[in-house]
Amino acid sequence: MRTATDKPKQLTIMVSSTVYGIEEVLEAAYDLLTSYGYEVWMSHKGSLPVFSNRSAFENCLEGVRKCDIFLGIIGTSYGTGIDKDDPKSLSIVHLELREAITLDKPRWLLTHDNVITARTLLMKLGHAGPKARAKLNLKRSDVLEDLRLIDMYEEAIFDRLPLAERKGNWVQKFHDRKDASPYIMNQFRRYQEIAAYLEEHFKSGPPLKPQAQQP
């Protein structure tokens, strides 16, 4: 238990390592979060602690494990780190999200509206779920680089769990910096409130909860 003379620990936020296409969102997020007093780990800004005896994957996943809060951003780029010889390999960004969910990290999530629109359209065309989408051949584009972005969104909202069991499934839609910035501002300017929440609910480690099924 912290005494009156102890200096409060600075809260650390890990921002998911997606970069391409949302640079302005990341810049705005970094400026806002640092202005509120958080230590921000963001690969885009070079502020994520890295060590030369670890791979890029390991450095990013270790950041997720050690941070206090995870800010996940699902953009239109699936991310790097995919093994071209293994069609089932996942990007760093996807693995970060899964790690945050597995650890039940206190998290806030943003998803580009292109991802949500594409999911809705494909569902109406009879391509609901990861297995159905995996049969499709999507041409890479700036609109939506990879259909596994939809998989990420569905994992974030716990799509496979019964509605009554879904907790921590709020995902905010955004299109650009003008949409993302107000959400980040309204959520994270409550520094003391968030610190108290973490102290109350996570001081003995994250609670156990039902996990989203992986495809």
Located regions from the model:
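Conserved catalytic or regulatory cores that recognize and/or transform ribose-phosphate-containing ligands
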Residues: 1-215
